[in-house]
Structures are given as C-alpha cells and as structure tokens.
Curated annotation (Swiss-Prot):
Segments forming domain Bulb-type lectin: 35-156
Domain Protein kinase positions: 515-814
Protein name: G-type lectin S-receptor-like serine/threonine-protein kinase At5g35370
Major location (coarse): membrane
Organism whose genome encodes this protein: Arabidopsis thaliana
Side of membrane Cytoplasmic, spans: 465-872
GO CC list: plasma membrane
Region (CaM-binding): 603-620
Subcellular location: Cell membrane
CDD domains recorded: B_lectin (cd00028), STKc_IRAK (cd14066)
Glycosites: 33, 148, 239, 303, 307, 342, 379, 389
Catalytic reaction list: L-seryl-[protein] + ATP = O-phospho-L-seryl-[protein] + ADP + H(+); L-threonyl-[protein] + ATP = O-phospho-L-threonyl-[protein] + ADP + H(+)
Superkingdom classification of source: Eukaryota
C-alpha cells in the first residue's frame, strides 16, 4: 500500500513538472536581459514567448499566416484562436527565423541575428529603466518600471488594427499592409480626423466613415478618438462622454477587431466560433477604392451581383507587363518625367468618374477647357484633368493616377469629363525625297559630294593623329603621378579591403541610368543631384561631388564605408558609389516626395496636416539622435535644414547629406555658410570659435521645427497681432493691432510663448485643425533647442523623449534666448533700409517690458555670429 502511494505521488509530481515546463515557454511577464527568437520557441509554442493571462493573445516572432518556412518574421501580437495579427513592430523590416527580440532595461529591440547588431526596430528612449514586459488580457504590450507604471505600450503605436478597449486618437492612423503575406506599409490608411474617420490613398482622401449607410451622426463636437466597443464602432468626443459618429453592430463580448485592410477597405470583424465574421466593411462600392483596377483601369460595378469588372478606357489597352492602361497609339505614352514637351490629352468620355473630384476643390472656376489643359501642362506633377462643363471648373489629378469608375444613371456625373495627360513621342521621319526628273541629278550630286567627302576625311585623319599623340603625352604624365603615394588617383579599389563598403558602380552605369545626367533634381554645397533609373527600374538619386578634400582612394572608401553602414528608417540609404578621377559620385535611394522645403513652402500641393508635421518632426529627431548616439562613430550633420529633409512614401522623413562634411576640402569648408546657403540655421558657435558639437545640429533642428509650426520660412511676410499696454496716470489701456510685413519668426515665437498665445503661431492654412496644446508642445521644444549656450540645449535623444511623452517638456530659459531680440532688431534695421529702396516693406512691433530681458551683447564675435545664425 505504501509503495502504491509513493508511485502515485511520483506520477503526480511528474505530471505537474510537465505542465510547468510546457507553460514556461508562454508567460504573461518577461524581464530584462531576455532574448527570444522564432527558432528558440518554435517547438514549444510556435514562436510565442508571451501569453496573456486569459490565453486570448500571444506575442512572439511570427511569420504571416504562421508559415514557419517564410523568410520574414515580425515581433507581433496575435489573437490565438483566429490567428489575426493585431500589432507588429518591425513591419517594414522583417527578420529571418534566427532574428531576435531583446528586452533590456533600456527597452525592446528587434535585431537581424548574424548580420548586424543595429536594431531594425526599437522602442523610443524611456523615462526610467524597464523592470518587466507584460502582455495584457486586452492584447496590449506594456513596458513597466519598478512601480508597475507604464513606460510604453503598443496600443499607442497601432499598425493596421485596433481591438476592444483600444483608442485611435485624433490625428493617429491605421496603415494597411501591402498584402496579407507582406506586412510592409501599403498605400491605404484610415485617419481619425476632427469631424470624421477618413480613408486615404497616397495622402488623398477617398472615403469617410459617415458615408456608410449604417453610420449615424449624433453630434458635431470635435472628434477625440475612435474606439471599438461591444456594441459597435464609435467616434467619441468630450473625453468619451459624447458620440459623434456611431456604427451599431450586434452586441457581443467576443473578440472584435477593426482593420485597415490591404484591399483598401476598412473592415470590422468578430470571431464567432471558429471563423472571423465580417460585420462592417467600407466603402461598400468596390469601385470607390482608388487602385482597385490599377493605374487608369476602368472599374464597372455590376449592381445585381455587386461584383466589379476591370477594363481600360476607349483608345487605351492593358500593358500586361506593368499592369497599367496605356494608349493604343504607339505615338503616345504616359509622361514619365518633367522633360516632356509635346503634350496631348486623351478624352475619357462622359460617365467616367474619379474619386479625388469628390474630396478636393477645383483649382479654378469659370475657365475654358483649353485653359484647364494649359494649367496641367505647366504643372510637372499633374497627370490629368477633370472638367465640369456647367460651372467650367477645373480639377487636377496630381502625383498619382488611380483607377477610374464608370458611373451609370447619374446625370450630375455626366457633366464631368476626364482627360489623361500624354506625351507625343518623337518620330524619326525621313526627309522628303527629291523628285528628280529623269534621274539626271545623281551624277551632279556625286560630283559635288565626293570631293567634299575626301576633304573632310583628310581633316578627320589629322584630328585622330593629333589626339593619339596627346593621349600618349598624357599617359606618360599620368604614370609619373600615379607612382606618388597618397594620390587619390593611385591604387585600385580591389588592392585593399575595407569592410562594409557599399556597391561600386561604374561611371558608365550611372551615366546610362541618369541619361547622361539629364534631370537635375537638386544642388547644394556638395554638388548637384540627378534622378536616375537602374536596369531593374529602381529609382535612384546620384550626387556628384566635384570638390573634395580627400587625398587617397583608401581614405575616400573608408568614409564611404562609414556612411554606407548607417541604417535607420529616418536616414536616406546610401546604395553605392563611383570614383572616377577627381570626381566622386554617391548613389542614394530616391525620395518620391522631394524635400520638406518644397512640400512646406511651395504652396502648390496640399497643405501638410498637423499630424504629418508632427511625424516629420519626430522622424527627423529620431534620425539625428541616431547619428549622434546610435552609430559606432558619432556623426554631426552640420547642415540640418528643410532642403536636407527628404520625404518618402506617406511623408516619412529621411535625412540626407549626413556624414558628407568630411568630404569637403578646406577651401570649401571655410566658405561653408555662403556656399551652402544655410544662414539662419547654423548655431552661433560656428563663428565664435567655440567647439562644434552635436548641439549645433540641435540648434538647426530647432529652427526647422519653428518653420514646421508656421508653415513658412523664419523670415517671411505674415500678419501679426500686437498687444500694447499704455500707462497714463495709473489709467491702463490695452489695444490690439494687426499688421502685415516681414517677420523674424523665432522672435515672434518667443513673444507669443511668453504671452501663452500659441495659436497665433500655427500655420493659418490649417484653419484650426490644431489645438493650442499641440502648438505649445512644438514651440517649447523648438525654443529649448535654440538656446544660445550649447550646454542648455537638449540632446536629440531627449527631444525624441519630449515628443513621445516619456520625458517632460522643457522650459525655455529666457536669459538664453534674449539673443533672438538682437537678431530681430538687426533684421528690422536691414529690412527698413531695403524698404526705403523700394525692395521690401518692414514693420516695427511694440514690445512689452519683461523683467528678465537682459541687454543684448554686441561684441564683434556676437555680431559676427548673427551673420550666420540670424535671419537669411
């Protein structure tokens, strides 16, 4: 009996041990110095290492659809029963099955194991050390400190989905993936606007939540967030007490998820039994999806079956290789560059609609059709027009052309006619023949041409002989020069090994890719930039550097290897290089939205929304923080300005020209401020002989941030309100005046900060789509960045923390910002001189007395620094 009892006890212990071991691989908490990979946990829990307490959600490194043979893995949170991914971190940078997720006291990082220790994704700088990582019952990943206070949570950084209990706040968006097997950011997104939920394709609105037949508008209060509830979908206001727009769904406590699908639809699904059931989908008409039939594809909806069919408009055919509708005529083509000169327009006919005409205003009213065409012809980004006959309104289609929609039985849409912009190809027409009588002219022509041909042949032979002699003389000189050690021309790139060197291009390759450097898209102190296309149709930007200070190929390659090894989502990637003689060429990835300077200041395109500006500011700060503290070697950019902040898809900012200051020679470096046109962004220490540190970049970033807030250059014409307080025998009177003229915006921002009037600083084109608190946040960060003393400026890592809320906002120190008053005074004086010459108008502002206003220093070095840091 005793032995039987001991045997049962042993079996029970083994069973408990088995349960413990099997559950140990998936737990609710993990702690710092924890490393996970798909390979490590694939056998015990199919890649999961975190499991919520209710066992509804799991977290780990997974591949789309749970395919373990996939080459792309993502650190994700997944609904266990349905397999739905509700959040992923490294969606644009998948790792292999051996890639790791590392938890340290500094946060989470995802690393491609075996390739580099540079993370492909990481959490931002945190306010305090991490003590644990938790997966909640709602599917929220939390980083907790020693007091169990949340330092970071995945719900604040949604990807394409939100679930019960999660809030998608005003200005935040869900970005659909490229496809269901590719989690990379696609072209569609769902954005929470101030009055509605908006769906966008490549930044263009194409649908609103309240357009759905099941949507009910309950109030007109400004929207604060979108939420998924047990009873449906709702846009909420007034701290969650008022519903603005609601979509009622059957009450259920089951798992419910709202997702921006890769198909371009916004879908709400519920897990019922064993499957996900779609409860809501918008838009209901598939032909309202901008790219449902590809570029210029014509979508036709069958009302009976609710299925759409795709075709091409009349006089166009499908290019099967590219999936694009192109003209049938071989003499016509879609314009591929701004160089097209011979422009034609193909009429699409009546009843053909385009989504953007429902969401944008016409550029002009009361125009004849030819004038509408002329506007498009002069606009490089214009791809076509839609013309409304009754109102004679002109709508432009810019940047991207999506699918067309065939409209049936809708008289108001039959008034709109579309036209596609086309290029007329040049034909090599033969010159008209000579209509000779009797053929007697041939001997005459021969008698004239033969002596001339002989004469020119002798000249050509003489030139060839002279060139051969010149080449021989040049070769002998080159042989002497090449033998000198340290010469940039000497040595072959293969004679020494430098790890991390990017791809080397031949000069002829780049010459062909750029069509002999035909299309210049930029220029600056480092040289000109040209657009090019590689044989695989990858777009590139080629930068020519003609004056450099390097003395040998090995030194050049070492610097290029350092730049080429830098990988960050907010830094322009160096794809390769070419060295030919004294000429250096750098090959970068191409940014399709150009520079921030053109997007923000040109006024031609749509206005950057506040959330887009915030994202650009945050992304730029992250890129600079990585250069300053994330690289093996600290890199000071030295030239932070809107022209060097490029915008990729979805206006993702990428910093260019980093690391290039070492390639300048001493002569060009001494002309740094004038040659590169950056006066107004450079910190005062550039001229005062103080040490240059990464804080010089912080100053430049602060100036750029102020321009993001106002939407104009820091020195520009604008309206300004001035409050003046007068004291006459203890009778106080206050007046407010509004004047227009040249304004030095940093000084204006300082004045408005002291008075707490932040809304006067925001870009008026936003028309109130920004709150005072949002404007205050950016202005305070910017003013902290432009402190005169470098030691008082925050690091870029601290700036990122202030943006993300993990670090309290800094307080600008007035005593370190009084130099802006001196700059403003000098600017006003110079502007008045110009105004007297009839060149510009200036304005003098009343200034209220401030107790902390100190006298401006006017030493020689201080005034000299104004020439660099002051308004340009």
């Amino acid at each position: 009996m005793k032995s039987t009892f001991l045997l049962l006890l042993l079996l029970l212990s083994l069973n408990l041990l088995f349960v413990f071991v099997s559950c140990a691989s998936s737990i609710e908490f993990v702690y710092p110095n924890f490393t996970a990979s798909n390979l490590r946990f694939v056998d015990s829990s199919k890649g999961a290492f975190l499991l919520s307490r209710n066992s509804i959600f799991k977290a780990g490194l997974f591949s789309p659809g749970g395919d373990d043979s996939s080459t792309g893995f993502y650190f994700s949170v997944v609904h266990v029963d349905s397999g739905s991914t509700i959040w992923s971190s490294n969606r644009d940078s998948p790792v292999s099955s051996s890639g790791t997720m590392n938890l340290t006291p500094q946060g989470i990082s995802v690393i491609e194991d075996g390739k580099s220790q540079i993370p492909v994704w990481s959490t931002p700088v945190l306010a305090s050390p991490v003590k644990s990582l938790r997966l909640t019952d709602a599917g929220n990943l939390l980083l907790l400190d020693h007091l169990n206070v949340s330092l970071w949570e995945s719900f604040d950084f949604p990807t394409d989905s939100i679930v019960l209990g999660q809030r998608l706040k005003l200005g935040m968006f869900l970005s659909g993936s490229v496809s269901r097997s590719d989690f990379s950011t696609g072209d569609y997104k769902f954005l929470v606007g101030e009055s509605d939920g908006l769906m966008q394709w490549r930044g263009q609105n194409y649908w609103k939540l309240r357009m759905h037949i099941r949507a009910n508008v309950d109030s007109n209060f400004p929207v604060e967030y979108l939420t998924v509830t047990t009873s449906g979908l709702a846009l909420m206001a007034r701290n969650g007490t008022v519903v603005v727009v609601r979509v009622a769904l059957p009450p259920s406590s089951d798992f419910r998820v709202a997702k921006m699908d890769s198909s371009g639809k916004f879908i709400v699904s519920r897990f019922s039994g064993k499957n996900l059931v779609t409860e809501f989908s918008g838009p209901m008409d598939s032909c309202q999806i901008p790219f449902v039939c590809g570029k210029l594809g014509l979508c036709n909806l069958d009302n009976a079956s609710e299925n759409q069919s795709c075709s091409c408009p009349d006089e166009m055919r499908m290019d099967a290789g590219k999936g694009v509708c192109v003209p049938v005529s071989q003499s016509l083509s879609l314009p591929v560059s701004c160089e097209a000169r011979n422009i034609s327009y193909l009429e699409l006919g009546l009843g053909v609609s385009y989504f953007s005409t429902h969401f944008t205003d016409p550029v002009e009213h009361g125009l004849p059709l030819l004038a509408c065409h002329d506007i498009c012809s002069k606009n490089c980004s214009c791809l076509g027009v839609f013309y409304e006959n009754t109102s004679r309104s002109c709508y432009l289609v810019k940047d991207s052309f999506g699918s067309l929609s065939l409209v049936k039985n809708s008289p108001e849409n039959h008034d709109l006619i579309g036209y596609v912009k086309l290029s007329i190809r040049k034909t090599n027409a033969q010159p008209p023949g000579n209509n000779n009588r009797g053929g007697s002219s041939f001997p005459v022509i021969a008698l004239v041409l033969l002596p001339c041909s002989g004469f020119f042949l002798l000249i050509a032979l003489g030139l060839l002989w002279w060139r051969r002699c010149a080449v021989m003389r040049y070769s002998s000189i080159r042989e002497k020069q090449v033998t000198r050690p340290g010469s940039f021309e000497s040595g072959d790139l293969g004679s020494f090994h430098i790890p991390g060197l990017p791809q080397k291009f031949e000069f002829e390759e780049l010459e062909q890719a750029t069509e002999n450097f035909k299309m210049q898209i930029g220029s600056g102190g480092f040289g000109s930039v040209y657009k090019g296309t590689l044989p695989d149709e990858t777009l590139i930007a080629v930068k020519k550097i003609t004056n450099h200070g390097l003395h040998g190929r090995q030194e050049f390659c070492t610097e290029i290897a350092i730049i080429g090894n830098i990988r960050h989502t907010n830094l322009v990637k160096l794809r390769g290089f070419c060295a030919r003689g004294r000429q250096l060429l750098l090959v970068y990835e191409y940014m399709n939205h150009g520079s921030l300077e053109k997007t923000l200041f040109s006024g031609n395109g749509p206005v950057l929304e506040w959330q887009e500006r915030f994202d650009i500011a945050l992304g730029t700060a992250r890129g600079l923080a990585y250069l300053h503290s994330g690289c093996d070697q600290k890199i000071i950019h030295c030239d932070v300005k809107p022209e060097n902040i490029l915008l990729h898809d979805h206006f993702q900012p990428k910093i260019s020209d980093f690391g290039l200051s070492k390639l300048l020679n001493q002569e060009e470096s001494s002309l740094f401020t004038t040659m590169r046109g950056t006066r107004g962004y450079l910190a005062p220490e550039w001229i005062t002989n103080a040490a240059i540190s990464e804080k010089a970049d912080v100053y430049s970033y602060g100036m750029v941030l102020l321009e993001l807030v106002s939407g104009r250059k820091n020195c520009s014409f604008r309206s300004r309100s001035n409050s003046v307080t007068e004291d006459n025998n203890q009778n106080h009177s206050s007046t407010t005046t509004t004047s227009t003229g040249l304004v030095y915006f940093p000084l204006y921002a300082l004045d408005m900060h002291e008075q707490g009037r932040y809304m006067e600083l925001a870009d008026p084109r936003l028309e109130g789509r920004v709150t005072s608190q949002e404007a205050e946040k950016l202005v305070r960060i910017a003013l902290c960045c432009v402190h005169e003393e470098p030691a008082l400026r925050p690091t870029m890592a601290a700036v990122v923390g202030m943006f993300e809320g993990s670090i309290p906002l800094g307080n600008p120190r007035m005593e370190s910002l009084n130099f802006l008053r001196f700059y403003g005074l000098r600017f006003a004086e110079s502007s008045m001189v110009e105004g007297q010459n009839g060149e510009s108008e200036t304005m003098v502002f009343h200034r209220r007395e401030s107790s902390n206003s100190g006298g401006s220093r006017q030493s020689a070095s201080y005034i000299a620094s104004q020439e660099v840091s002051g308004p340009r």
